[in-house]
């Protein structure tokens, strides 16, 4: 495991300062787009993980973004893999990681 690659990802600089809604069809910077075009590759690679720094975003993440992006990944890959592959923080809004985990846990615990 010492050869694992940890990707440092600054959300506001590398993706958007304005996280959007749930689906691509609803506008730019959606949870669906971030999940499928940024995170999916990392989750499918056995030796990659990501640290997402959400410091500097202008508008906060909507519940629909958090659910579609992070919640659906946790549901698909399982909470243990999710927690191993992804770390999330924000220096200017420390409660944001807790908010994200609420939607992750909710998605994992919902019966299909």
Regions found by a protein language model. Give the residues of each.
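Short, Lys/Arg-rich amphipathic alpha-helical interaction segments
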Residues: 98-112
């Amino acid at each position: 495991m010492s050869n694992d690659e940890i990707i440092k990802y600054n959300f506001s600089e590398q993706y958007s300062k304005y996280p959007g809604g749930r689906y691509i069809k609803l506008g730019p910077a959606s949870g669906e787009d971030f999940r499928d075009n940024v995170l999916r590759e990392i989750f499918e690679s056995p030796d990659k993980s990501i640290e997402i720094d959400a410091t500097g975003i202008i508008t906060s993440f909507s519940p629909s973004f958090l659910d579609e992006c992070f919640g659906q990944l946790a549901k698909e890959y399982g909470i243990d893999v999710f927690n191993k592959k992804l770390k999330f923080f924000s220096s200017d809004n420390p409660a944001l990681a807790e908010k994200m985990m609420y939607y992750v846990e909710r998605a994992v615990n919902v019966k299909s």
